From Swiss-Prot:
Listed name of the protein: ATP-dependent RNA helicase homolog DQX1
Summary of the function given for this chain in its UniProt record: Might be involved in RNA metabolism; it is missing helicase motif III and may not have helicase activity.
Subcellular location: Nucleus
Placement of sequence motif DEAQ box: 170-173
Residue stretches of biased makeup (Acidic residues): 8-20
Disordered, as annotated region: 1-21, 694-719
Domain (Helicase ATP-binding): residue spans on this chain: 57-225
Gene Ontology cellular-component annotations: spliceosomal complex
Chain residues that bind ATP: 70-77
Species annotation: Bos taurus
Length: 719
């Protein structure tokens, strides 16, 4: 079989002079001249030397599992999917197609574009991709690149998994929650709806290879040789810079002025610093015009979308590229033209605390293997250069060897919902590469129980099954379902999309005019209604990009929200949930929307304790303030802060801020939250007040029922 597969590429891909009639076996069309040019580049990749042994292992592995270990830039992410496509083609597609998972949607999109180009095929036909709000596949697709969380959602849903001949789990060393869980499910053979002879290929950096070998029980392993050439010797700074962005900009300008050949890759901790660096460099490189074409400055982060392809395109007149990125490009996005690397040695990551149900933005050193992967970007003949904006002792003393598994740092409620959907009653029955903390699992189960997603036996309830269908956080999915009861589905669809998409506001207003335009979008009822108002104004503008720029809005995020809203609407129609007519702005709709939100977010309620905006969280007695971006704080003549608020998120990274906040009435909390939730609140004045309201409501209900009974008895007596 392997020898036959070799023939697909080696013999059907001759030079144009050797055969003008060679056709592509995937679509039956003659190869283009670009195919041969790219084929020569592919054959020069380090992974090409391992092609034959990989195909042998893929055919003969007793367990159906093959492990591939290779450094960033060796070509494994682009070539292995193509070889697997040849594998299923040689079988006449009798055993399904090839699915490749990626930990980041942007990586799935970028790889699909590149691989379709290398295979001389049309994107969306034989090669496609599936990422949030964008499914570029068709009936002819045999090679699909997919965000790993989407595949996990498919596996858990009633839609089934479809036929797959080969499943490739790429970039396993990134340790995403979905990738780790997919490996656990596959290892335990719990994907019963997949073909029995499914092939699984796990692709990783060498740093995680020993752990994966042990986890999978010693499967056949392909070790990709290192790139030719040596790695640069890193140059360290004596101390951490006071301003990372300025230090990185100065280093870039120095390299450009020295006319050192090659492109530059800059690693900074966050998207905010990436944007600041790109803005600063774009201004400063204009001074280099007298030395030739100014460098082209390009950001690379999850919000780039299809613009990511600019990092691969040739620049006009041979201008240098300066790519500014963060942890996203530690292992993904191989850029062969990079000769210089600037590494801040830091990353900004969200870390979830289950004890207080809060996220914090943690600035921390990257792992040692991440730092090594960054340095390898500049390997070659001769080696490039690597400037580390930190002392040599910084990582040696403070950095772990491997990246932290995301299963230790994320809210696991959605994960638990999927495990329950797979009928794994106990988390202990599922194998993890690294087991989550017990308190994180217990908090996730407790949250699902409060949301009525579990029955008395701890299995998914009927409501929980429906919740698991939605690509939303469980509490947001519950609020969306509650909107069916309260007749505000249209507004909740918009709100769910806006809360799930990237943030719509990119930055604070830069001038008085922009601030006034943005203030006009604020709604008196709070941030949730403001988000709905922003979306509706965006749609009324015709999704105009200039309209967004004038108000400091993220046009790409709003477009993403529009797509997601359409997906959610289609899903609700498919499972036959009731819809409602738009009624945004009416008094009744305002109350109904609050009730729907409280139905899902009763765990996220706070009370102003002293009338000054110091809010005490009901569930954990932490004190927090409203975010500076909250509409209640941005009003010119602020009244007394709302007494009771519902919030979307609580961050403990800076000043304990509540984000996306709206006022609610405590009576709604008593009416809609489970009674045992109120009973389990920690002792506080707020709990006593809510329990008093509950008793009054119970007494009122008893009196009303008694009055109705008396009236019925009187009516019977008259008869």
């Amino acid at each position: 079989m392997a020898s036959q597969l070799l023939g697909l590429e080696e013999e059907s891909g001759p030079n144009p002079e050797e055969s003008e009639l060679a056709v592509n076996p995937f679509d039956g069309l003659p190869f283009s001249s670009r195919y041969y040019k790219l084929l020569e580049q592919r054959r020069s990749l380090p992974v090409w030397a391992a092609r034959f042994i990989f195909l042998e292992h893929l055919e003969s592995s007793p367990s159906g599992v093959v492990l591939v270990s290779g450094e960033p830039g060796c070509g494994k992410s682009t070539q292995i999917p193509q070889w697997c496509a040849e594998f299923v083609l040689a079988r006449g597609f009798q055993k399904g197609w090839v699915t490749v998972t990626q930990p980041y949607p942007l990586a799935a999109l970028s790889l699909a574009l590149r691989v379709a180009d290398e295979m001389d095929l049309t994107l969306g036909h034989e090669v496609g991709y599936s990422i949030p709000q964008e499914d570029c596949t068709g009936p002819d697709t045999l090679l699909r690149f997919c965000w790993d969380r989407l595949l996990l959602q498919e596996v858990a849903s009633t839609r089934g998994t479809g036929a797959r001949g080969v499943l490739i789990l790429d970039e396993a060393q990134e340790r995403s929650v979905a990738s780790d869980l997919l490996q656990g499910l596959l290892r335990d053979a719990r994907l019963g709806s997949l073909p029995g002879d499914l092939r699984v290929v796990v692709v990783t950096d060498p740093s995680l290879e020993p752990k994966l070998q042990d986890f999978w029980g010693g499967p056949p392993t392909v070790c990709v040789p290192r790139k030719t050439g040596s790695c640069p010797t890193p140059v360290y700074r004596d101390s951490l810079p006071a301003d990372r962005v300025d230090a990185a900009c100065q280093a870039v300008l120095e390299w450009c002025q020295e006319e050192a050949p090659g492109d530059v890759l800059v690693y900074l901790p966050s998207e905010e610093e990436i944007s600041l660096c790109c803005e600063s460099l774009s201004r400063k490189v204009r001074s280099l015009e007298n030395q030739g074409p100014p460098p082209r400055v390009l950001p690379l982060h999850p919000g780039c979308g299809q613009a990511v392809q600019a990092v691969y395109e040739d620049t006009e007149s041979g201008a240098r590229k300066v790519v500014v990125t963060h942890w996203l490009a530690d292992f993904s996005f191989s850029l062969p033209s990079i000769r210089h690397v600037i590494d801040s040695g830091l990353e900004l990551r969200s870390v979830y605390s289950p004890q207080i149900r809060a996220e914090s933005q943690v600035l921390r050193p990257v792992s040692k293997c991440q730092a090594e992967a960054r340095r390898l970007r500049a390997a070659g003949i001769p080696p490039g250069s690597c400037l580390c904006l930190y002392p040599k002792s910084f990582l040696e003393l403070e950095a772990p060897y491997l990246p932290q598994p995301r299963v230790w740092a994320e809210n696991l409620s959605s994960l638990m919902l999927l495990l329950k959907r797979r009928q794994i009653a106990e988390p202990g029955k599922c194998h993890f590469l690294d087991r989550p903390a017990p308190e994180a699992l217990m908090q996730a189960l407790e949250d699902l129980d409060y949301l009525a997603a579990l029955d008395d036996d701890g299995d998914l309830s009927d409501l929980g099954v429906i919740l698991s269908e939605f690509p939303l956080a469980p509490e947001l999915a519950k609020a969306l379902l509650a909107s069916c009861e309260f007749d505000c589905v249209d507004e909740m669809l918009t709100l769910a999309a806006m809360l799930t998409a990237a943030p719509g506001f990119t930055r604070p207003p830069v001038c008085a005019e922009e601030a006034a335009l943005r203030r006009a979008l604020e709604h008196v009822d709070g941030d949730h209604s403001s988000l709905i108002q922003v979306y509706e104004a965006f749609i009324q503008s015709g999704a105009d990009k200039a309209w967004c720029q004038a108000r400091g809005l993220n046009w790409a995020a709003l477009c993403q929200a529009r797509k997601l809203r359409g997906e959610l609407l289609e899903l609700m129609q498919r499972i036959e949930l009731p819809l409602s007519q738009p009624a945004f702005g009416s008094e009744r709709n305002r109350r109904d929307l609050q009730k729907a939100l409280v139905s899902g977010y009763f765990l996220k309620v706070a009370r102003d304790t002293d009338g000054t905006g110091n809010y005490l969280l009901l569930t954990h007695k932490h004190v927090a303030q409203l975010s500076p971006n909250c509409c209640y704080r941005s009003r010119r003549a602020p009244a007394r802060p709302p007494l009771w608020v519902l919030y979307h998120s609580f961050s403990i990274s800076k000043d304990n801020c509540l984000s996306i906040v709206s006022e609610i009435q405590p009576q709604m909390l008593v009416e809609l939250a489970p009674p045992y939730f109120l009973s389990n609140l920690p002792p506080s004045e707020s709990r006593d007040f809510l329990n008093q309201l509950r008793e009054e409501r119970t007494d009122s209900s008893i009196r009303s029922e008694s009055s109705s009974t008396q009236e019925l008895e009187n009516a019977c007596a008259l008869q």
